[in-house]
Design a protein with these regions (language model features):
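Charged, glycine-rich active-site and insertion segments that engage polyanionic ligands
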Residues: 1-54, 62, 71-74, 144-147, ...
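Conserved catalytic network of the ASCE P-loop NTPase/AAA+ motor domain
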Residues: 26-29, 59-63, 75-79, 108-114, ...
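AAA+/P-loop NTPase substrate/partner-engagement loops
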Residues: 64-95, 156
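ATP/adenylate-binding site constellation spanning eukaryotic-like Ser/Thr protein kinases
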Residues: 80, 100, 132, 163, ...
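Conserved Rossmann-like nucleotide-binding pocket used by diverse enzymes
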Residues: 84, 120, 167
Length: 341
């Protein structure tokens, strides 16, 4: 941790999970591994860091990091001997096996201060196959006094053997009114509701979007997608145009737009948030059964942006499915030939 990443207070939508884990800590019943799972933008990493800070704090009993003891000062400086974070190295999208082996070797050492040892892996779904297998050995034979916190927005990408050896702590987005009230205390403005629609009520992601002029972007992207589906835009030049923008922000919008389309198109999927403005005739042409696979493609593209990639090619991959034969949008699953199935 650094002063910029020192644990934030638990957010209102995290209170239940916080009190449960705090009770386990106070009662001496903490598990050796937890999987903190839920959509992005809910503050799971903040939660993990605060829990680690509470456990390592010298104050007893600690219900939060005091911020003033030796342990808290070292955590803020990133020098605590009993705390580690494991994440993809700069320019990579995966956590590699050598990183996990090094982490496991450190956790096997005696505690620097005679207490617990904490490690956070984030995002845990970035573990490649070899790294996950290496971590599994640590999970199967935990070193006494160690606690592993795995943070993931896509837990299904983790091997079942890893998931089964962790206690799972689920995080869900707050209701719209609660999220809107929280953002209103910090940013407010007319774009707050739009930002929440972008992100599926994920307050932290929405708060970040409120500062990025998303209203104008929303109007532009909505118009472009409408023109693409109507056959008035070619996907390749449009992909080139998208690649010159903040592509992470564009794909965040596309994920929200697709989720809104899914809610409108699939019976029982819930009420749309107003991002997708397609008329009923256009909606009827969408292959609804493949929308889930397409949404996965968008999220995978967002992950791919962490590494040096051909941005235009990524955008083309996501736009071409909407310009299928006869200009009828066909959302297809990865690996399937277009126009089949």
């Amino acid at each position: 941790m650094t002063p910029e990443t020192f644990p934030a207070p638990p957010y209102p939508w995290q209170q239940r999970a916080w009190h449960w884990l705090l009770g386990a800590y106070a009662g001496g019943t903490l598990s050796h591994a937890y999987l903190l799972e839920g959509p992005e933008g809910l503050g799971k990493l903040d939660f993990a860091r605060r829990l680690a800070g509470t456990i390592l704090c010298d104050e007893e009993p600690a219900s939060s990091p005091c911020g003033a003891c030796r342990a808290c000062i070292q955590l803020a400086a990133g020098s605590h001997p009993d705390y580690r974070e494991c994440a993809p190295e700069e320019g990579r999208s995966a956590i590699l096996v050598d990183q996990v082996r090094a982490l496991s070797a450190e956790l096997a050492l005696s505690s620097g201060y005679g207490g617990a040892r904490l490690a956070i892996l984030h995002p845990a779904d970035a573990l490649n196959a070899n790294a996950a297998n290496s971590l599994l050995k640590t999970l199967e034979e935990p070193v006494p006094g160690t606690v592993l916190l795995l943070v993931s927005a896509r837990p299904a990408m983790l091997p079942a053997t890893v998931r089964s050896r962790c206690q799972r702590v689920g995080f869900t987005a707050p209701g719209r009114d609660e999220a809107l009230a929280w953002i209103g205390e910090r940013a407010g403005g007319p774009e707050a509701e739009l930002a929440l629609a972008f992100t599926g009520n994920a307050p932290l992601r929405a708060l970040d979007l409120c500062t990025q002029g998303i209203g104008e972007l929303h109007e532009s992207l909505s118009r472009e997608m409408g023109e693409l589906l109507a056959g008035r835009r070619d996907p390749v030049p449009l992909a080139e145009e998208w690649s010159t923008r903040d592509l992470a922000l564009v794909l965040t919008w596309l994920a929200g737009w697709t989720g809104d389309l899914l809610r409108r198109r699939v019976p029982g999927a819930g009420r749309g948030a107003g991002l997708c403005r397609l008329d009923e005739a256009s909606l009827a042409e969408v292959d609804a059964g493949r929308l889930f696979a397409y949404l996965d493609m968008v999220y995978e593209a967002l992950v791919a942006l962490r590494t040096p990639r051909n941005r235009q090619q990524l955008a083309e991959t996501l736009l071409l499915p909407w310009a299928g034969p006869g200009r009828k949008p066909r959302v297809y699953a990865p690996g399937l030939a277009r126009g089949t199935g």
